[in-house]
Amino acid sequence: MVRDKMGKKITGLLDGDRVIVFDKNGISKLSARHYGNVEGNFLSLSLVEALYLINLGWLEVKYKDNKPLSFEELYEYARNVEERLCLKYLVYKDLRTRGYIVKTGLKYGADFRLYERGANIDKEHSVYLVKVFPEDSSFLLSELTGFVRVAHSVRKKLLIAIVDADGDIVYYNMTYVKP
């Protein structure tokens, strides 16, 4: 695992559908890299973010018995808590690896919000809303139109991420065009 410049692993505690970090130094390091959301005196990470950070070797997650969970153990837990976890994790990992800043898109009915590489997220808005689908999914054209309209109404573009059975991802950039 690559530790990059994080040094010692940061400890988080599994709490339902999120992982909580209380260590001030850990909060500072992770929030500076745009992971999680600072909520008072702690940082809240999504399960997808926590899995990604465990995979990087930056985070260890503890549960009830205070024993660190492996990536596989957290993954199995998270699959029972979050729909389409595997697909979302693959897309999150791919986008983060490409240098994008990825945040939750829940408030917009999307899986993620995507910021440009190097964006100052305190001063700039996200550019894309990302919706993740398995390759074999289907939806009505009216549903797709609805996704695009929501993105347009909040001045964002829609990125549809299609994940195939091998874990390969194809992205489709959708924009609203007024006839």
UniProtKB/Swiss-Prot annotation:
SUPFAM superfamilies: tRNA-intron endonuclease catalytic domain-like, tRNA-intron endonuclease N-terminal domain-like. It catalyses: pretRNA = a 3'-half-tRNA molecule with a 5'-OH end + a 5'-half-tRNA molecule with a 2',3'-cyclic phosphate end + an intron with a 2',3'-cyclic phosphate and a 5'-hydroxyl terminus. GO terms for molecular function: endonuclease activity; lyase activity; nucleic acid binding; tRNA-intron endonuclease activity. GO terms for biological process: tRNA processing; tRNA splicing, via endonucleolytic cleavage and ligation. Its EC number is 4.6.1.16. The active site is at residues 115, 125, 156. It holds the Pfam family tRNA_int_endo. Keywords: Lyase, tRNA processing. GO terms for cellular component: cytoplasm. InterPro entries: tRNA_endonuc-like_dom_sf (IPR011856), tRNA_intron_Endo_cat-like_sf (IPR036167), tRNA_intron_Endonuc_cat-like (IPR006677), tRNA_intron_Endonuc_N (IPR006678), tRNA_intron_Endonuc_N_sf (IPR036740), tRNA_splic (IPR006676), tRNA_splic_arch_short (IPR016442). Homotetramer; although the tetramer contains four active sites, only two participate in the cleavage. Therefore, it should be considered as a dimer of dimers. Belongs to the tRNA-intron endonuclease family. Archaeal short subfamily. Endonuclease that removes tRNA introns. Cleaves pre-tRNA at the 5'- and 3'-splice sites to release the intron. The products are an intron and two tRNA half-molecules bearing 2',3' cyclic phosphate and 5'-OH termini. Recognizes a pseudosymmetric substrate in which 2 bulged loops of 3 bases are separated by a stem of 4 bp. This is tRNA-splicing endonuclease. The gene is endA.
